[in-house]
Regions:
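A short, proline-enriched helix->beta-strand linker immediately N-terminal to the Walker B motif
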Residues: 125-129
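Conserved ABC ATPase signature
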Residues: 106-110, 114
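Helix N-cap at the start of a conserved alpha-helix in ABC-type nucleotide-binding domains
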Residues: 142-144
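Helix-to-loop junction immediately C-terminal to a conserved catalytic motif
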Residues: 20
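Conserved ABC ATPase "signature" region
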Residues: 35-36, 83-101
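Catalytic Walker B motif of ABC-type/P-loop ATPase nucleotide-binding domains
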Residues: 131-134
């Protein structure tokens, strides 16, 4: 999994929209599995996008639908499964994100952390090969954010998809990704393993990660 980090306004969300095929680049190409996303045929683009899963910023759940119907939505739109098969898969996925028993509730009736879990279940219900996570922990307290990161990690271990996480929050993130790219003013300023990024001497990288370093340093001290 790759984490795209950087300050607000660095270009993370714009890059994500390019990768998802929502924005056409002014120059350059977006290659996914060797296919040029913006120069391929409509049928090729459709087939490629059907392999995508997306956890949108804020969850983007349908307020008028129950948790069950939100998660079932991609299957009803993209698959030929029967309602019985859909029900079986949805309930299984909800159990895996620790939401058994919540299928009849509406988004307004559950917490922010639970809504993120519903959004994750919906993003992966059709077994995508590539999953895009847009600010998956924004608005959550540190403990809930960490639990979402761990849930993303366990889901990735189970399904083995390629994951791209866009975020400006690094708490608990570096323990679940393989590579990190830091964006600055629309360009990738640093790219490497979490360890390499943490040890970078690039001033912009060090400044961005200073709160993360301070937290780790404080957490590592023994209580008096």
């Amino acid at each position: 999994m790759l984490a795209l980090i950087g300050r607000s306004g660095a270009g993370k969300s714009v890059l994500l929209r390019h990768l998802m095929g929502l924005v056409r680049p002014d120059k350059g190409r977006v290659l996914i599995e060797g296919v040029d996303l913006h120069r391929s045929s409509p049928s090729q683009r459709k087939a490629l996008k059907e392999r995508f899963g997306v956890l949108f910023q804020g969850g983007a759940l349908f307020d008028s639908m129950t948790v069950f119907d939100n998660v079932a939505f991609p299957l009803r739109e993209k698959s030929r499964l029967s309602e019985e098969e859909i029900r079986e898969r949805v309930l299984k996925e909800l159990a895996l994100v620790e939401l058994s028993g919540a299928e009849g509730k509406y988004p307004a009736e559950i917490s922010g952390g639970m809504r993120k879990r519903v959004a994750l279940a919906r993003a992966i219900i059709h077994n995508p090969k590539i999953v895009f996570f847009d600010e998956p922990t924004t608005g959550l307290d540190p403990i809930t954010a960490r639990s979402i990161h761990q849930l993303i990690h366990s889901t990735h271990s189970r399904l083995r998809f390629t994951g791209v996480i866009v975020t400006h929050e690094t708490w608990g993130l570096f323990s679940i990704v393989d590579r990190v790219a830091l964006l600055h003013e629309g360009r990738i300023l640093a790219l490497g393993s979490p360890e390499q990024i943490m040890e970078s001497r690039e001033p912009v990288v060090r400044e961005f990660l200073e709160p993360h370093r301070s937290f780790r340093s404080t957490a590592g001290q023994e209580a008096p």
